[in-house]
Amino acid sequence: MKKKVLFILHLPPPVHGSSMVGKYIMDSSIINAGINSEFINLGTSKSLDEIGKNPFQKIGLYVKIVLQTFKQLMVFKPDLVYIALTAKGKAFYKDAFIALLAKLFGKKNVYHLHNRSMVERQEKWLDVMLCKMLFKNTDVILLSKFLYPEIQKYVPQSRVYFCPNGIPPISNSFIKKEDSQEVQILFLSNLMKAKGVFVLLEACKILKEKQLPFHCTFVGGESDITSEIFQKKVSELDLSEKVHYAGKKYGAEKEKAFSEADIFAFPTLNETFGLVNLEAMQFSLPVVSTLEGGIPDIIMEGKTGFLVEKDDAQAFAEKLEMLIVDPVLRLKMGREGRKRYEENFTLEAFENCFTTILNELIK
């Protein structure tokens, strides 16, 4: 008889790293073939700009999630409860209640952490007590070995599994753009301060002052940085001729944006893994990113791209400059990045790794 697994996770919308991984898990024939699975969506927001808003509506949605969980624990009787536990903000407490409910039923829990904030929670005695309860005798899946310090206070390494994310192959064929006089830099993520939007704009200002031939396109949904705020900053830095905001793009439009780029820039200030870096590598783009979260497990410094300290526009600009002036280096790093993606970060590689972990947990 197949073992039963209850997956409590995030599903799009909105589109972000955790919700996309949740969708990959739910849709995977490899992961679900050997188990009897049920799914509950943890999300209470339908778009990024809803996050932190409409509290009364979200209370109703959360009550529904709790009732769904209670019903599945009673009726489905899972052998394992998988929870994509949110570590950040107030969402931590709502997810923690779900996890403790499963523990109350005597269920074996495994937490898959897609974001970070456990270190900050060690400063609050209530959070420390809650974390001790949550993580006691519980297994954890992390995206990178660089993330273990986040939870080492609560979880021995013997109970930690490492499973890097993966992404599906490109769905459409694309034609690489013809060479132009300006090197095309792409930023693709939500417009958030935490994603380093302003850092990249400052770096672009430095590049412009050096009279380097480049153009930077920003693609992504509005968040704590609106289109108006973005354009105001662009004007302040006198970058109107060098920077363009192209809005949100999905599917073929997003792939076209990648195919038209020469360099991918992701100066994120707060990241767990960064699926978008994998997408850039899939398109044979050299990546300039930050020494943040599990990114050093993805980008090989000096081989598939460059990594700099976060919030350092000067250092970021210097690495971009190296790629702008050296087309041979761009192509070489891009090819190495594509090779690294194919060997380590395909969706199938993620599915196989995740399935191995599940089988270990439910055997």
Where are each of the predicted segments found?
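Aromatic "clamp/platform" in nucleotide-sugar-dependent glycosyltransferases that forms part
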Residues: 269
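Glycosyltransferase donor-sugar binding loop
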Residues: 41-45, 188, 215-231, 247
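Short hydrophobic beta-strand element within catalytic cores of glycosyltransferases
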Residues: 286-289
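Conserved acidic donor-binding segment of nucleotide-sugar-dependent glycosyltransferases
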Residues: 301-302, 306-313, 322-328
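A short, well-ordered alpha-helix in the C-terminal region of glycosyltransferases
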Residues: 315, 322, 329-344, 350
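Conserved donor-binding/catalytic core segment of Leloir-type glycosyltransferases
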Residues: 6-8, 176-204, 216-222
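Nucleotide-activated donor-binding/catalytic signature segment of Leloir-type glycosyltransferases, i.e.
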Residues: 229-249
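Donor nucleotide-sugar binding/catalytic pocket of nucleotide-sugar-dependent glycosyltransferases
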Residues: 131-173
